[in-house]
């Protein structure tokens, strides 16, 4: 059984597209995205939409990483301090992209 595992796309859509191209050429039996698909980069929403399509169409499996947990937390909890507010600038942007 061939298993492809990738992680740390960090919301860079061209990187995810390149990964998909390589994986598709390899023809694995199973594909696992091992976290950190979103956050930090410019296109969390685009990466999530593309991966979700692969999940639905091809059965790719997601595993949440710390960035997914952090983005989800931003959707439900206000920053605890001014320092956390500054840290969350990009994460809040990622939340806005994926919440739509």
Where does each model-flagged region fall?
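Active-site neighborhood of divalent metal-dependent phosphoester bond hydrolases
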Residues: 40, 47-100
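N-terminal active-site segment of His-dependent metallophosphoesterases
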Residues: 1-50, 56-60
């Amino acid at each position: 059984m061939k298993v492809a595992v990738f992680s740390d796309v960090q919301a860079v859509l061209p990187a995810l597209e390149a990964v998909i191209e390589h994986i598709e050429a390899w023809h694995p039996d199973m594909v696992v995205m091992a976290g950190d698909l979103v956050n930090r980069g410019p296109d969390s929403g685009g990466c999530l939409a593309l991966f979700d399509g692969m999940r639905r169409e091809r059965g790719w499996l997601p595993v949440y990483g710390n960035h997914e947990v952090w983005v989800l937390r931003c959707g439900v909890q206000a920053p605890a301090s001014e320092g956390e507010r500054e840290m969350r600038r990009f994460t809040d942007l990622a939340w806005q992209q994926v919440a739509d």
